[in-house]
Amino acid sequence: MQEPHRQPAICLSTRLAKARLYLCTDARRERGDLAQFVNAALAGGVDIVQLRDKGSVGEQQFGPLEARDALAACEIFTDATGRHDALFAVNDRADIARAAGADVLHLGQGDLPPGVARQIVCRQMLIGLSTHDRHQVAAAVAALDAGLVDYFCVGPCWPTPTKPDRPAPGLELVRAAAELAGDKPWFAIGGIDAQRLPDVLHAGARRIVVVRAITAAADPRAAAEQLISTLTATS
């Protein structure tokens, strides 16, 4: 595998601060179009793209994404994000994130604590955290202030098929995050698409994470362009 690219920590933090549109996608094994898809989404204005294969169609058809296959997919992400000056994130797996030279490691509430993950990944790697209630948001803000995480996500805003068993706290949690976090880096997530985006922005979010709004689009680039246009008009 090629030596992973490394970005200076200050560069990563600056790019995170400017990021508005964050895409989560699986490895698209059942389609075989990962490189084409990721490049199209990034060309449309996606700022951060994350590999998250858990619960995907590919996992149902072929089984869990093995470490070697995950690293092969990461090479595609690394190449595409380098070409488009975007950030590459890995979900959950600190070992994969480090081996792949990812820019970002994203953690759920049940994953490694951020302080432990920080001991595994390189010092300049950004770390994000999912939050699902007001208490978790407040804890994430404190962790951000302490330098344990670099951003957090809030949601889901609406129920999603990627996490069918998780209740959706809705836009009330987005409003709480806007109150608690202010202009710190945080993203609303969960069921957001072009039609729902104005409601999310009205609730106080300025950054979003999407999945199906782009992964299920007939034209991923156009879908990303539509979302980023609305986001930048509000910023």
Swiss-Prot record:
Cofactor(s) needed by this chain: Mg(2+)
Sample GO molecular function, one term: magnesium ion binding
InterPro entries tied to this protein: Aldolase_TIM, ThiamineP_synth_sf, ThiamineP_synth_TenI, TMP_synthase
Domain of life of the organism encoding this protein: Bacteria
Residues the record lists as binding Mg(2+): D92, D111
Enzyme class: transferase
Segment forming the signal sequence: none
Family matches, as CDD domains: TMP_TenI (cd00564)
Pathway stated in the Swiss-Prot or TrEMBL entry: Cofactor biosynthesis; thiamine diphosphate biosynthesis; thiamine phosphate from 4-amino-2-methyl-5-diphosphomethylpyrimidine and 4-methyl-5-(2-phosphoethyl)-thiazole: step 1/1
Residue sites binding 2-[(2R,5Z)-2-carboxy-4-methylthiazol-5(2H)-ylidene]ethyl phosphate per the record: T160, P161, T162, G191
Reaction it catalyzes: 2-[(2R,5Z)-2-carboxy-4-methylthiazol-5(2H)-ylidene]ethyl phosphate + 4-amino-2-methyl-5-(diphosphooxymethyl)pyrimidine + 2 H(+) = thiamine phosphate + CO2 + diphosphate; 2-(2-carboxy-4-methylthiazol-5-yl)ethyl phosphate + 4-amino-2-methyl-5-(diphosphooxymethyl)pyrimidine + 2 H(+) = thiamine phosphate + CO2 + diphosphate; 4-methyl-5-(2-phosphooxyethyl)-thiazole + 4-amino-2-methyl-5-(diphosphooxymethyl)pyrimidine + H(+) = thiamine phosphate + diphosphate
Function: Condenses 4-methyl-5-(beta-hydroxyethyl)thiazole monophosphate (THZ-P) and 2-methyl-4-amino-5-hydroxymethyl pyrimidine pyrophosphate (HMP-PP) to form thiamine monophosphate (TMP).
HAMAP family with a match to the protein in the record: TMP_synthase (MF_00097)
NCBIfam families xrefs: thiE
Protein name: Thiamine-phosphate synthase
Species name: Mycobacterium leprae (strain TN)
